[in-house]
Curated annotation (Swiss-Prot):
UniProt-listed PANTHER family: LARGE RIBOSOMAL SUBUNIT PROTEIN BL34M, MITOCHONDRIAL RIBOSOMAL PROTEIN 34 FAMILY MEMBER
Keyword set, alphabetical order: Ribonucleoprotein, Ribosomal protein
GO biological process: translation
CC terms in the record's Gene Ontology section: ribonucleoprotein complex; ribosome
Protein name (record): Large ribosomal subunit protein bL34
InterPro entries: Ribosomal_bL34 (IPR000271), Ribosomal_bL34_CS (IPR020939)
Organism in which the protein naturally occurs: Wolbachia sp. subsp. Drosophila simulans (strain wRi)
Organism superkingdom: Bacteria
Lineage, top ranks: Bacteria, Pseudomonadati, Pseudomonadota, Alphaproteobacteria, Rickettsiales
Family, as annotated: Belongs to the bacterial ribosomal protein bL34 family.
């Protein structure tokens, strides 16, 4: 059976990257929350 995690940087960026977060209202909410928590890394 194939493992579920097959790492690919492009897919990682497209799904969880900064621009995909900024594209939706919910994504911007995530970024604001992570900023308020003081996360150094906001996205993938």
């Amino acid at each position: 059976m194939k493992r579920t995690f097959q790492p690919k940087n492009l897919i990682r960026k497209r799904r969880h990257g900064f621009r995909s977060r900024m594209a939706t209202r919910a994504g911007r909410k995530i970024l604001n929350r992570r900023r308020s928590l003081g996360c150094n890394k906001l996205c993938a």
